[in-house]
Amino acid sequence: MGKTNDWLDFDQLVEDSVRDALKPPSMYKVILVNDDYTPMEFVIDVLQKFFSYDVERATQLMFAVHYQGKAICGVFTAEVAETKVAMVNKYARENEHPLLCTLEKA
C-alpha cells in the first residue's frame, strides 16, 4: 500500500514541477522618466539605440516622456528588462545626462 502512495506523490511532484516550468515568465515594464536637463535628441537616441524604435516612434515616445512625465519603452522578461535599464542608465551617465530608466512589474 505504501508503494502506491509513493508513486502518487511522485506523480504529483512531477506534475507540479512541469506546471511550474511551463509558467510564462514574469514581465516587467521598462520606463523612461522625464527630467529638466536631458536633451530631447538624446532621449530619441536612447529609444532608437536600446529599444530599436524608428525615429518617428522614438519621437512620439520622447514627447510622451516629456509631457506625461514618463513613458513605457517596452515590456520584457525580468532579465531583459534589468539589462536594458542598466544599459540605458550607464549610457546616460557616460554622456553626463540625468535621464532615469526604471522598471516595474507589468
Curated annotation (Swiss-Prot):
SUPFAM superfamilies: ClpS-like (SSF54736). GO terms for biological process: protein catabolic process; proteolysis. InterPro entries: ClpS, ClpS_core, Ribosomal_bL12_C/ClpS-like. It holds the Pfam family ClpS. It comes from the Bacteria. Belongs to the ClpS family. HAMAP family: ClpS. Involved in the modulation of the specificity of the ClpAP-mediated ATP-dependent protein degradation. Binds to the N-terminal domain of the chaperone ClpA. NCBIfam families: PRK00033.1-3 (NF000670), PRK00033.1-5 (NF000672). This is ATP-dependent Clp protease adapter protein ClpS. It comes from Salmonella gallinarum (strain 287/91 / NCTC 13346). The gene is clpS.
